[in-house]
Structure formats: C-alpha cells, structure tokens
UniProtKB/Swiss-Prot annotation:
Biological function: Catalyzes the conversion of L-lactate to pyruvate. Is coupled to the respiratory chain.
Pfam families in the cross-refs: FMN_dh (PF01070)
FMN hydroxy acid dehydrogenase domain: residues covered: 1-380
Reaction equation(s) it catalyzes: (S)-lactate + A = pyruvate + AH2
The keyword Secreted appears for this protein: no
Top EC class for this record: oxidoreductase
Any GO BP annotation: aerobic respiration
Name by which UniProt lists this protein: L-lactate dehydrogenase
Name of the encoding gene: lldD
Length: 388
C-alpha cells in the first residue's frame, strides 16, 4: 500500500498484526474518550498562517536535557515493542539514533537494556515505573547506568493499571486468551514467522534479568499488576533522585500543581501525558493541559509532551502550546509493525517534512520562533462538539 502519513502506517499495522497486538497498542481505557480527545484537541488548534516572512531555510534542531537533537521529537517508552517487529526495541532505537533523536526503552520491553544499548552508537533513555519491588527498581537503575544510559524517564501515572476493555475482546486478556492469540497468529503468517518464530525470546528482558527466569506474556500481566504501588508519594522517590546522577524526567503530569511539585522535587523535566488515554478515561488531553502547565513552570525545567501526536503539524501545535519537545508512541509503533526500522526512519522523515512545511507557512525559521502566536485561538469547534 502507499504510505504517506502515520495514518497509513496504522492501517498497514492493522493488516499485518494479530488483532490482540493491534488493539493493545491502538486502544485506550474504558470508553476511550480521552484517547479520541488527544487527537481531536490537537487538530482543533488552528495554525496561524503567515506569508512573505522571508523564512528561507528552516532549522528543526534543538537542545533538550543538554542533548543536541535533529528535531524536538523522541520515541516514547512503549511496553512490548519487541512483539510488533523482530527485536523491535533494537530496530526502533537504531532508527531513532540514525535520525538524531532519543529512543526511550520501556521497563517492560522484550529486549533488555543491555541488548538495546549495545546495538546503538549513542545513549538511549530508560523508563522506569513506580513499583512495590524496590529491589527490581534498584537493579534496573544500576544496569541502565552501567550500560551507559544517563537519562531516566520515571512514570508516575500508573499507581494502578487502567481498565482497557478492548483487551478482553481482542485476546490480550479475557477468556481463553492464550488459545485466541494462537489462532490469530496462525492467521497472520508473516508476523508469525518474522516475529513469532524469528524474534524470540519473547520474554520481558529487563524483568527476566532480575528474576533470573523467563517472564512470559501471561507472567507479564500478573507480575506488573501485582507490583503497582498506589501508596507512593514524592518522599518515596527521594532515594531515586539521590541515586540517579543524570537527567531525571517525570512522566504523567497533567496538573500545574503536580508540575510545581516536580520542580520542588528536583526533576530536570516532565512529560505532560495521560498515558495515551490508556489510564484514566475522561481526563484532559495533553494539548489542553499543556498551556496551564507551561504558565506554571516554563523555564524551570524541560517540558515534554506525548499523547495524540500523529504528524509534524501536531508537533508544531504542541510546541506552540508550550512544550519544548514531544514524544511519539503509537505513531512509531505502527510504522515499526508495518516496516521495521525502515518504517520508523521513514515516519520520522515524514514528521520532519511536515514540520518544515508548517513552520515555513507560519513564519518560523527555528524551533525558538514557535510560540502561542503561531496559533489562532479557535473555540467554535470544541464548543460545538461539547454541545452535541
């Protein structure tokens, strides 16, 4: 099929993947209202077109967390990425490194910290959950640092797992899940051979390294669910801040007061995120949450955002809302599932091209030129939708 956008990669991924995997990455929590709003609220932000501004050459480069990047984009941590392509985390990390942007490895990745970092020429980022098993957390931090990783992304919006109804219907969970997944794999032979057969082992590399035993998909759900810690507070994280000597970014902030708490805690940055609409349905989209957070803490830390970003236009919109950079989640996984490393590299080229067009037509020569003045304040469409 013809690929010209991230939506094309989504369709290609849908065709290639067994349903339990496609719907796991594609779905959200409960009725998926926040999942939809993440995309819709960004698209409702009208870019302010300017002409005859002598833009000339557009420069996408920027510096985030003292790292020089080709553009203000990174790849977000996504669990089980290695199930979407053969050794998927490695392929995605190689694509990101080739394009001069960071890749963030999930705690619950298929490929281990050591495997991924050894296959790329620059340090990746590592994401860690707040878990009851402090021994695992300490082990993961020590291994990440020893591997050369210096940027830690600490996810705080998962004290309990979100309810994702699609998973029960797709076969990721629910009655006879293992049998349903097996049947789906048989009906998708290209995936079954490339990933199912040639992409082994399919355990969770970081968890298995700590537990000293293979952690299967079935084990993953139980182990992770039993280890979430809803009792944790900022004071419980102080040992991590003391242990980790590199940049530390808090992921999962939607409220300005939580952003101020992150500043007081000593975080180097935050990620304005609702976990891609996969945790609490009905919360603000990242696009709507960003302006108030930027007003509260802009200049005191690095502001990143994820959730709902599908195009270079969305990147520019989120930067105009106050973000310093963004992370792509679903968009890169769709491309990875469809075409591996080459798909991710092509997606990033598409994103960069779309950014250049948007910046040229809004009169921005450099990332620093993007501001709230790059948007037309439009309220009619969001209000009209709310009234329906």
């Amino acid at each position: 099929m013809i690929i010209s956008s991230s939506s094309d990669y989504r369709e290609a991924a849908r065709r290639r993947l067994p349903p339990f995997l496609f719907h796991y990455i594609d779905g959200g929590a409960y009725a998926e209202a926040t999942l939809r709003r993440n995309v819709e609220d960004l698209s409702d932000l009208a870019l302010r077109q300017r002409v005859l501004k002598s833009v000339g050459e557009v420069d996408l480069s920027t510096t985030l967390l003292k790292q020089q990047l080709s553009m203000p984009v990174g790849l977000a941590p996504v669990g089980l990425t290695g199930m979407y392509a053969r050794r998927g985390e490695v392929q995605a990390a190689q694509a990101a490194t080739q394009k001069g942007i960071p890749f963030t490895l999930s705690t619950v990745s298929v490929c281990s910290i050591e495997e991924v970092q050894s296959q790329v020429g620059k340090p990746i980022w590592f994401q860690l959950y707040v878990l009851k098993d402090r021994g695992f957390m300490k082990n993961a931090l020590e291994r990440a640092w020893a591997a050369g990783i210096r940027t830690l992304v600490f996810t705080v919006d998962m004290p309990v797992p979100g309810a994702r109804y699609r998973d029960a219907h797709s076969g990721m969970s629910g009655p006879n899940a293992a049998f349903r997944r097996m049947v789906q794999a048989v009906l998708h032979p290209f995936w079954a051979y490339d990933v199912g057969l040639m992409g082994t082992p399919h355990d969770l590399g970081n968890v298995s390294a700590y537990r000293k035993e293979k952690t299967s998909l079935e084990d993953y759900v139980g182990w992770l669910g039993n280890n979430f810690d809803p009792s944790i507070g900022w004071k419980d994280l102080e040992w991590i801040r003391e242990f980790w000597k590199g940049p530390m970014v808090i992921k999962g902030i939607l409220d300005p007061e939580d952003a101020r708490d992150a500043v007081r805690f000593g975080a180097d940055g935050i990620i304005v995120s609702n976990h891609g609409g996969r945790q609490l349905d009905g919360v603000l989209s990242s696009a709507r949450a960003m302006p108030a957070i930027a007003d509260a803490v802009k200049g005191e830390m690095t502001l990143l955002a994820d959730s709902g970003i599908r195009s270079g236009l969305d990147v520019v919109r989120m930067l105009a809302q106050g973000a310093d950079g963004v992370l792509l989640g679903r968009a890169f996984v769709y491309a990875l599932a469809a075409a591996g490393r080459a798909g991710v590299e092509n997606l990033l080229d598409i994103i960069a091209k779309e950014m250049r067009v948007a910046m040229t037509l809004t009169g921005a020569r450099a990332i620093s030129d993007i501001s709230r003045d790059s948007l037309v304040r439009e309220i009619e469409r969001p209000l009209a939708r709310a009234a329906q």
